[in-house]
Amino acid sequence: MSSRERIGSNHHSRVSQGMSTSGSSSSRHHDTISSTSDPRHLRDHQISLSDILENKIAVQAAEIDRLSNDNRKLASSYVALKEDLTVADREVQGLRAHIRKTETDHEIQIRSTLEKIAKMEGMVKNRENIRREVQSAHIEAHRLAREREELASKVKLGMKDLKKVCLEAESLEASSQELERLKEEHQRLRKEFEEEKSGNVEKLAQLKGMERKIIGAVKAIEKLRSEISTARNKAVEN
């Protein structure tokens, strides 16, 4: 039951009691009048009835004052509650705006991190191909090493043949020309061998550099994944 309902109920009870008291007084008054016609008794009874009415009026006035005070208190409480409700509504709106901003910031951070991961994954998407190329380079290096050994063996045989030809054809012009030809061939073969050796070393250096880049890219991806996990945990906590 609200304050106003309680106040109205109390007022109604008091009014009913007053009316009941008035009814009883009137009944006693009629009984008194019927029992005696003495003017003195009539005057005393009128004075007593006047006092009763004045007391009733005073009680009702006090009740009205009390009800007015209660109404003023209720009005003040209503105004205070309305102001508190307004302040609470503003705080709720502020909290909602803060939550939306926080969610937007987390979404932007997560999206940026995902884009970085996508770029890094694109850089290492051909990781297996690069590894196969490195393996092929190692195989090529071994092949070149075998060819080098074969070439060295051929050069050695050529030198033996050259010496043999020189010994057999010292007096012949043709032997001299063949010797010059074999020397030129030997120099050419040596030059080719040195060029192939140099090219192979450069290629191996490039492949090693690519391996280092792959390792760095893998570490960067692991770091970015850790950052995404941390950002998601913070979004859930918020």
UniProtKB/Swiss-Prot annotation:
> Can you tell me which residues the record assigns to a coiled coil?
50-237
Keywords, comma-separated and alphabetical: Coiled coil, Developmental protein, Differentiation, Flowering
Say what the protein does: Involved in FLC activation and flowering time control, but has no transcriptional activation activity. Probably part of the FRI-C complex, but is not redundant with FLX.
Against InterPro entries, the record matches this protein to: FLX/FLX-like
The entry assigns this protein to a family as follows: Belongs to the FLX family.
Q: From the Swiss-Prot or TrEMBL record, give the protein name.
A: Protein FLX-like 4
Composition bias type Low complexity, residue spans: 15-26
Entry superkingdom: Eukaryota
- List, as start-end ranges, the regions of compositional bias called Basic and acidic residues: 28-42
Region described as Disordered: spans on this chain:
1-42
Q: What gene is this protein translated from?
A: FLXL4
Q: Quick one: signal sequence residues?
A: none
What do mutants without this gene show? Early flowering.
